[in-house]
Amino acid sequence: MYILILIGIIGLAVLKAVLSLPGRIGKSGERRVARKLEWLSEGYIVRNDIMLPTQYGTTQIDHVVVSPYGIFVIETKNYKGWIFGYENSEEWKQSLVGKKRWYGWSSEQHKFRNPIRQNKAHTIAIKNILSDLGDFKIIPIVVFSDHADLKITTPNYLVVNWCDLRSVIRQHSTPCISESSIKAIISKLDSANIKEKEIRQTHVASVQRNLTQRKHAIENRICPKCGAALVERYGRYGTFLGCSSYPKCKFTVNLD
């Protein structure tokens, strides 16, 4: 009996660990956003989980919404807690309040790549794919979980919670894309979308490898963009590492 109980406890612990993996958490958030986008009116055409070719390989886009009012390119982050960041910073920070201990509340902090920069790469890929059709209005949006408290400074960029996503999209109400162009855009995106499992797996492995290499480079005070040395500097928002080849290379990363 005790063995069965122990096996059950271990099984639940393993299941919780698997469900807490970043990849699964991310996919859960993407599904949540996809369901919200389904409730937009018929004039909005949604495509989820698109992978497009680029000059550097491939890029994966969480959601694209094509409408008469523009093309919305959406990056989903299923994060909770306090989210700190600036529009042009290399990294943002997630701060989580944990359990109450005898010495006070425990907390965790995690850094992650600035999602605005991620989404800029997505918008460039879409522009390149659609270049022969015309120059269309593209509205990039970063959307976080409703459990995230956004303490960010992004005056030129839309960063919202799940609950505000549809209303933010509907705020764009000036028609700028014709019905025929919408059909051509969807056709172009669908034909360019890479669906082969092997290529998608290669993309995921490449992203993980690049993140690891980038982390190691920064730890060794080497610029991951150009290979020059990173030097410590002090700016308006505190101490940071900047590329020694500035202004030729403008890579920076905050120091906490």
Regions found by a protein language model. Name each.
Residues M1-T59, V66-I71, K77-E87, E91-D256:
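Surface-exposed interaction regions that form or flank ligand-binding interfaces
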